[in-house]
From Swiss-Prot:
Keywords: Endoplasmic reticulum, Glycosyltransferase, Membrane, Signal-anchor, Transferase, Transmembrane, Transmembrane helix. It is found in: Endoplasmic reticulum membrane. GO terms for cellular component: endoplasmic reticulum membrane. Belongs to the glycosyltransferase 2 family. GO terms for biological process: protein N-linked glycosylation. This is Dolichyl-phosphate beta-glucosyltransferase ALG5A. It comes from Trichomonas vaginalis (strain ATCC PRA-98 / G3). Gene3D superfamilies: Spore Coat Polysaccharide Biosynthesis Protein SpsA, Chain A (3.90.550.10). The keyword Nucleotide-binding does not apply. Dolichyl-phosphate beta-glucosyltransferase involved in the glycosylation of glycoproteins through the synthesis of dolichyl beta-D-glucosyl phosphate which serves as a sugar donor for transfer of three glucose residues to the Man-9-GlcNAc-2-PP-dolichol precursor to N-glycans. Pathway: Protein modification; protein glycosylation.
Length: 323
């Protein structure tokens, strides 16, 4: 009898401890987003305010466009890149071949590629600038330190010119040809709303080749993702997502998570704003050199817990941060 009494006491103490930890987390939740920091005065070292473009006598600093301006091209591609000097050229070559082919068939198909160098330690920056010398609609957004995949995507998506905005990974795991699948679907959704997202799904595609370990980890993370508030989506982590300009604006000025777990938060924000979300299969292949480690998985799980708690209790607010 004393033993079970002891177990009960331990249980209630455990619950109280968890409750205390959650309360402390909520009390210390930072509602500041990367968008807020981009509104800092000029001269503040934390402010990102220009692209880097090749110029005849060196590199030129080109002022950012803003997501709040009217679109001036049809499609913006946002590519987060961290130490991608080896894999980025192949992806860019394939992407450019596709874009040029579309452009030749349809002169109204205008585009830009925004590559966000997330504090790379290799020659990613130089690779991008070499391509930008040949293609003036390739832009480099250079983050001087590594801020995380989420921060890179957010910075890129807040400073694009496109009517449509496509997220894609630098490793080329998803082929650019599948853009047309997402494009057709989002145009259908845009008949009734200007806030829509179409996401690529590896889970629905039999062609996807994934190792048993990746499948096991994916199942575990998916369980946490459902608990964080994302329902009805089989694959949140695929880096192939297409946004309307309006959905891009509303989501990324409210995004808080700056590392690997940005994808579930993007969908949580979209759900809370009542956006239409569609999921379609895309061809995907696992690429050597993936950088997700066990420590990254732990950080991702922590961020999922924050998403689940902070968005539900209002510690992370969704609002028009321009005002």
């Amino acid at each position: 009898m004393k033993f079970w009494r002891f177990v009960q006491i331990l249980f209630f103490l455990g619950v109280a401890a968890v409750g205390l930890v959650v309360a402390v987390m909520i009390a210390n939740a930072d509602d500041t987003t990367l968008f807020d920091r981009m509104q800092l005065p000029d001269g503040d070292p934390n402010k990102l305010n220009y692209y880097i473009q090749p110029a005849p006598n060196g590199n030129e600093k080109v002022p950012f466009p803003t997501i709040f301006d009217p679109a001036s091209v049809y499609l913006s591609l946002v590519v987060p890149a961290y130490n991608e000097e080896k894999r980025l050229p192949k992806m860019l070559d394939e992407t450019l071949n596709y874009l040029k082919s579309r452009e030749e068939k349809d002169k109204s198909f205008t585009w830009e590629i925004v590559i966000v160098n997330d504090g790379s330690k290799d020659k990613t920056k130089e690779v991008v600038l070499n391509y930008a010398k040949e293609y003036p609609n390739i832009f480099l957004l250079n983050q001087p330190v590594n801020m995380g995949k989420g921060a890179a995507i957010q910075a890129g998506c807040l400073h694009v010119r496109g009517e449509l905005v496509l997220m894609l990974d630098a490793d080329g795991a998803t082929k650019i040809d599948d853009f047309e699948v997402l494009e057709k679907e989002i145009k259908s959704l845009m008949k009734t709303t200007n806030q829509a997202i179409v996401i690529g799904s590896r889970a629905q595609n039999e062609k996807a080749k994934r190792t048993p370990l990746r499948k096991f980890l994916s199942i575990g993370m998916h369980t946490l993702i459902v608990l964080s508030g994302v329902h009805g989506i089989r694959d949140t982590q695929c880096g192939f997502k297409l946004f309307t300009r309006e959905s891009c604006k509303m989501i990324f000025m409210n995004q808080h998570v700056q590392r690997w777990c940005c994808d579930p938060e993007i969908l949580v924000i979209a759900r809370r704003l009542g956006m239409k979300i569609s999921e379609l299969p895309v061809e995907w292949n696992e690429i050597d050199g993936s950088k997700m480690k066990i420590s990254g998985m732990i950080k991702m799980a922590t961020d999922l817990i924050k998403i689940a708690i902070f968005h539900r209790v209002g510690a992370w607010k969704i609002r028009d941060r321009r005002h």
